[in-house]
């Protein structure tokens, strides 16, 4: 089996090298090449988000009324969560359920999200991560820790600010082993406002462009010639 570079285990902890990056601007202002470069990153284990918010804050969430029961004295109450009638992850592999809950504990205790333990944001974190969309759960279920990371690509060409729930999702998935890539042709700040400290690298690749329309990336042609680019900096570990 071919292991990903820098993959390791320490006792019962799996250490997964991941990317969390924001790519600002458009190289040389060439829009068609910009979309082609993003298209090149998409694999069968890639999810692309281009409409916001991805997680609707007011959408039905069966577990939300109960989350205050699930975090006591600085610890996630795993047994109580798993035995609760509203717990929806029982169909996942046991190791994936444990992985989700372990990373949820870390996300809260490290206070990665602004407002944690100050205004109840920890409960928003709990309700968000315990009610993940089906497509995310399917990606987690088939996650092989020893191979290449699944990717989440988030494209925001306009002025909409990412929601708190989407910021929680991306921070969690990065802890869980996903590569997270934000493509922001405008260069605007979006996700940064939700973090207590710098979480991601920013790569300025070119001039800022506005009001771009995201095409159907499955129909975008791949680059004709492979040249060294900002992608090599992002994925230098592969």
Indicate where each model-derived feature is located.
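Conserved N-terminal ligand/cofactor-binding loop architecture of enzyme catalytic domains
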Residues: 1, 14-25, 32-127, 201-237
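Short boundary motifs at domain starts and secondary-structure transition points
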Residues: 2-13, 136-147
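Histidine-anchored nucleotide/phosphate-binding helix
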Residues: 3-8, 28-44, 163-179
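Phenylalanine-focused residue identity feature
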Residues: 7, 20, 52, 70, ...
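Short hydrophobic beta-strand segments
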Residues: 7-25, 148-157
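Active-site and donor-binding regions of nucleotide-sugar-utilizing enzymes
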Residues: 125-143, 150-194, 198, 202
């Amino acid at each position: 089996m071919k292991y990903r570079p820098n993959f390791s285990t320490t006792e019962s902890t799996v250490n997964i090298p991941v990317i969390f990056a924001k790519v600002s601007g458009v190289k040389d202002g060439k829009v068609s090449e910009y979309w082609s470069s993003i298209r090149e990153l998409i694999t069968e284990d890639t999810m692309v988000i281009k409409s916001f918010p991805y997680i609707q804050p007011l959408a039905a969430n069966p577990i939300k009324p109960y989350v205050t029961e699930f975090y006591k004295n600085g610890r996630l109450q795993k047994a109580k969560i798993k035995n609760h009638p509203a717990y929806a992850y029982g169909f996942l592999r046991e190791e994936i359920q444990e992985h989700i809950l372990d990373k949820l504990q870390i996300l809260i205790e490290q206070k990665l999200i602004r407002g944690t333990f100050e205004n109840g944001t920890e409960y928003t974190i709990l309700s968000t991560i315990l009610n993940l969309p089906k497509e995310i759960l399917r990606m987690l279920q088939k996650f092989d820790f020893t191979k290449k990371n699944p990717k989440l690509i988030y494209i925001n060409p306009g002025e909409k600010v990412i929601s708190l729930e989407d910021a929680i999702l991306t921070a969690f998935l990065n802890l869980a082993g996903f590569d997270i890539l934000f493509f922001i042709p405008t260069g605007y700040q979006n996700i940064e406002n939700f973090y207590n400290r710098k979480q991601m690298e920013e790569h300025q690749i070119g001039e800022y462009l506005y009001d771009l329309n995201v095409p159907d990336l499955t129909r975008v042609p791949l680059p004709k010639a492979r040249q060294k680019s900002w992608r090599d900096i992002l994925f230098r570990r592969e």
